[in-house]
Amino acid sequence: MKNNAFGKEKGWIELIYGPMFAGKSEELLRKLKRLDYADVIYQVFKPKIDTRTKNKIMSRDGRNMDSFEFDNPYEIFDKLLSLEVNPHVVAIDEAQFADESIVDVCQALADSGYIVYVSALDKNFKNEPFMVTAKIACIAEYVEKLSAICTDCGAPGTATQRIINDKPSNYDEPVVQIGNYETYTVKCRHHHKIPGKPFPEEIKKFKSDLRNLLKNKENK
């Protein structure tokens, strides 16, 4: 391997996150392909629950790379210890599907000298944070947040919208549902809809009072 920063005993975490269709896996693949030019050895992982591509991570433009699938994040340790050649970089795609032990795994890997690339959704279809991703963002040295395009207005799409029978999913539906274009789209904050989402009375009152205030000003 060429003499570069990846060959030194330094570890860190880089997180790529955002909504669906923002190019997270594509960016992860780009970063990994770039390592090939410097002969940097890497190993790719993803949670087994992601059944869209078996033993591969794949971008929506068709690029892909072999990966090791795990049920328990601690299996990452076992896989690394079994390899004949120890990698310098560990990449984890779709990390939001892992349980919260993935946070400790990423921390331990970086502490042990690995460079850790993580790709994950930032929020679920309810527009609420995936806590796994939020915690990784707190411990990562480098964080890159991507956005997509709102399919209604073309503004930055930052919220993943789940669609069932051509309608937005209700708030009380299960968080995890594996899908692609047939199930999900992306909206901006103003076009994202979550039927049945509860709001504190204080927020309801503020929004109502603000609407009335603005309406009264328009009528003057």
From Swiss-Prot:
Catalytic activity: thymidine + ATP = dTMP + ADP + H(+)
UniProt GO molecular function: ATP binding; thymidine kinase activity; zinc ion binding
Main location: cytoplasm
Top-level EC class as recorded in UniProt: transferase
Keywords assigned by UniProt, alphabetized: ATP-binding, Cytoplasm, DNA synthesis, Kinase, Metal-binding, Nucleotide-binding, Transferase, Zinc
SUPFAM superfamilies: Glucocorticoid receptor-like (DNA-binding domain) (SSF57716), P-loop containing nucleoside triphosphate hydrolases (SSF52540)
Entry's localization field: Cytoplasm
Protein name: Thymidine kinase
